[in-house]
Amino acid sequence: MTAKGSTKQEILDAALELFSVQGYEATSISQLAEAVGIRKASLYSHFENKQAILDALMQATLEQYEQHSIFAKADWDDPAFTKDKENMTPDMAVQLCLGQIRYILHDPQISRARKMLTIEQFRNRQMASMQTKRNYTDVMSYFTGLVRFLVRRGQLADSDPEIMAAQLCLPVSVWLNLCDREPEREAEATRLIERHIRQFFDVYRAK
């Protein structure tokens, strides 16, 4: 990476950190330049304005999400995707969910991007759409697909798959948000999530 490319990435990293704490509107170009250790005028040689920085951050965030999120890559009609889920057990479901949660909470880029989206979703329509897609639409689609798949295989009772998916995944979102606000409660939330998933499989186990 060239020096200019390195500085550009440093600006993006600093912007993500500041935007995730104090929001886009409250962060000035001067603060961004100071965080990187460059002059304000120098920053404009990398980005036209603050909006251009935000646009670049959103694009990078979307690319990382598409690459790493289990929800974005789900294809329940693809045998290659469903192969390792054919004999899904409560233990497997717990590990699947907790693995994704740990990634979301502890990957610095993803964690900061989520907080930035939470702050900015009420001021930026594009961010609101991204927040809805990432935290609701894709999650519900993934778990509805999982439930339908397990019902077809005779592992879960045949009920309303969308409501079953909501019962499974939406409480987990509440605990995930709790961890964002109070990181010290992650162990507590993890225990509750595990109990919740196991109870779901007990309640809906095919008779």
Regions found by a protein language model. Name each.
Residues 56, 69-107, 164-165:
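Hydrophobic alpha-helical connector segments
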Residues 16, 20, 24, 62, ...:
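Short amphipathic alpha-helical interface segments enriched in basic and hydrophobic/aromatic residues
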Residues 50, 57, 61, 65, ...:
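Hydrophobic/aromatic residues within well-ordered alpha-helical segments
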Residues 129-133, 137, 147-198:
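Hydrophobic/aromatic-rich alpha-helical bundle segments in the mid-to-C-terminal region
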Residues 10, 14, 18-60:
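Helix-turn-helix
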Residues 1-6, 76-77:
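N-terminal intrinsically disordered/low-complexity leader segments
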Residues 105-118, 122-152:
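Amphipathic alpha-helical packing segments from all-alpha helical-bundle domains
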